Amino acid sequence: MAITAALVKELRERTGAGMMDCKKALQEVDGDMEAAIELMRKSGQAKAAKKAGRVAAEGVILVKSEGNQATLVELNCETDFVARDDSFLEFGDKVINAAFANKENDVEALKTTDIDGQTVEKTREDLVAKIGENMNVRRVQTLEAGDVVATYTHGARIGVAVALTGGDEDLARDLCMHVAASSPQFVKPEDVAAEVVEKERSIQVDIAMQSGKPKEIAEKMVEGRMRKFTGEISLTGQPFVKDPSMTVGELLKKAGADVVTFVRFEVGEGIERKEEDFASEVQAQVAAASKG
């Protein structure tokens, strides 16, 4: 029987599995839809796909470095319990090693990389079927720059890498800890993206205009607030966590060093977690019971 695009589409919709996996399953059972679903359930593919809709906002940040290269990977799961599971962590080790070896920056490319004779994605699907939780290789970034690269992890939930020119490993590690604690978004105030500056400036202009101050004073207020804003979200403009009497920029100048770039990953940042409304759930159950 010919395996049509419509058949593959239907199987994808019913299992949530990948297109190639669906096509392969249909070919193996000569186009029998129900047999293909059963085959995929037995192999764990349908089971893994069914769990793919769950929010995976827990997990670990994996970090590997050598010389002036560092690679970070975020590996997510649904619960903190699985984040400590040996099988999950063993999978994570294989993923970070593969990402580091390939100097990977593309998570989709990482998913197609071979580990132990099969792709990262297939290994993930097998592990989902085994453990019973959704998990996801969410992102990867490799930093290769500067004279000195240091890394820091905080409880496996935050991972940081910093690349310096000048300075030494102690300074680089101190800056890693600072980045972990203070979450800068840019290296220097002048690096702040134009759209970020424009959005904040429009807000500050509205606030200044509502103050009733003369135009020239309002303009100075806006400029002062913008300097403060760009300083607060940039690494060199922030007070150094180990000595707030100086900024990171002043610390770097004193050490004769510069930050080339940095990476900061935190588990689950930007993932919308599902909020469980237990009160509404109980009310619905009570209402249903009273009708019965």
UniProtKB/Swiss-Prot annotation:
Its main location: cytoplasm. GO terms for molecular function: translation elongation factor activity. Residues 79-82 are annotated as: Involved in Mg(2+) ion dislocation from EF-Tu. The keyword Manganese does not apply. It holds the Pfam family EF_TS. GO terms for cellular component: cytoplasm. InterPro entries: EF-Ts_dimer_sf (IPR036402), Transl_elong_EFTs/EF1B (IPR001816), Transl_elong_EFTs/EF1B_dimer (IPR014039), Transl_elong_Ts_CS (IPR018101), UBA-like_sf (IPR009060). Keywords: Cytoplasm, Elongation factor, Protein biosynthesis. The keyword ATP-binding does not apply. It is found in: Cytoplasm. It comes from the Bacteria. Belongs to the EF-Ts family. HAMAP family: EF_Ts. PANTHER family: ELONGATION FACTOR TS (PTHR11741), ELONGATION FACTOR TS, MITOCHONDRIAL (PTHR11741:SF0). Associates with the EF-Tu.GDP complex and induces the exchange of GDP to GTP. It remains bound to the aminoacyl-tRNA.EF-Tu.GTP complex up to the GTP hydrolysis stage on the ribosome. This is Elongation factor Ts. It comes from Idiomarina loihiensis (strain ATCC BAA-735 / DSM 15497 / L2-TR). The lineage of its organism: Bacteria, Pseudomonadati, Pseudomonadota, Gammaproteobacteria, Alteromonadales.
